[in-house]
Amino acid sequence: MLGERVAQLNAEYARAIDDDRLEQWPDFFTDPCLYKITSADNHRRGLEAGLIYADSRGMLQDRVAALREANIYERQAYRHLVGLPALRPGDDGMVSAETPFLVVRVMRDGTMDLFATGRYVDVMVDEGGALRFRERIVVCDSSRVDTLLAIPL
């Protein structure tokens, strides 16, 4: 049952991003939280800095506001393919999981390309019956990341 809840959380998370409902994205996280995008090499070496780093829901909301109002980038959409999570139940009601992902980027002109592959390294907690991410570290397989990394992975 827990595995199904985690898989459902991942599906809803991906759908919100893919459907351009970015304003809902921060709601998948606790406050405080950690959201970071990094490379597999940096993650393996324990380097804290990420391509994107946020440690509160407010920072996630600011990122969405910047995407909507301030940043200029070519219109694009993502399509996530998310694998099944490998769970590691933890202490204090927290659940850890690693989940593989693949993201295809679709540009305004219809061009599609493989944008990112990797795994989500998550710590989740139950808040009032709903699972939320306390930590989501997006570990990209490649250290080469397109400069158009605008939308959350």
For each feature predicted by the language model, list its residue ranges:
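A beta-strand edge to alpha-helix "cap/lid" segment located at domain peripheries
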Residues: L81, A86-L153
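Hydrophobic pocket/interface hotspot
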Residues: Y13, W25, L60, A97, ...
